[in-house]
């Protein structure tokens, strides 16, 4: 029995439960951070602030992918922890994305690099405040990425199911990062000037930075945690047919996963 309403897959109750798992993990990490030094407290505070809120789409697709495939639900804490770990991965990408895009805000707050740039100015720190903000944003993004892996691998889930899901998580991390590289390349104008090449590149950006990363891989991870990869491997596409476009990948997968054989 799942404690959340499938007709409202990203309900406030679901989002609050994901947030609780994230905060619990950060509370545990606080002991490690405090032992290293008080200078790191602002970084941990920023991790709390920037992982708060959000739609929690990736955790939701992971959770409900599991629900669609599982004969019996796994222990709720383990499933929620594994699903919530994807939010750390997402926020890591957002922190770095904001830095590359020179964005000033994120989720109603100053972006991480702007936040620490301002903190440097208030403290009258040495050197350029902008550089300090950029440096801390890179490091916080890296830390969030490492925490995502740590939170996932420490989830109280059967070892064989974590092992089955791990290659999918590896692919998710690689694809979103490569999708970001494609995005930067597309904006640079270095990928060729003909419209067909440009359209192909944009399609791959959408595929790997959005559709696969947001929907397909999280769903697949949930299915793997359900121990149902054998059934589902033949059902989802590894990539979208060119004639259908990248966004169709997620649609095909969701349609196929709704009626398992």
Describe the function of each predicted region.
Residues 95-98, 147, 151:
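Membrane-spanning helices that line or support transport/gating and their immediate boundary helices
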Residues 1-86, 91, 95-96, 100-130, ...:
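Conserved N-terminal diphosphate/IPP-binding helix and adjacent helical/loop segment
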Residues 32-36, 50-59, 135-147, 153-260:
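All-alpha helical catalytic cores of prenyl diphosphate-utilizing isoprenoid enzymes
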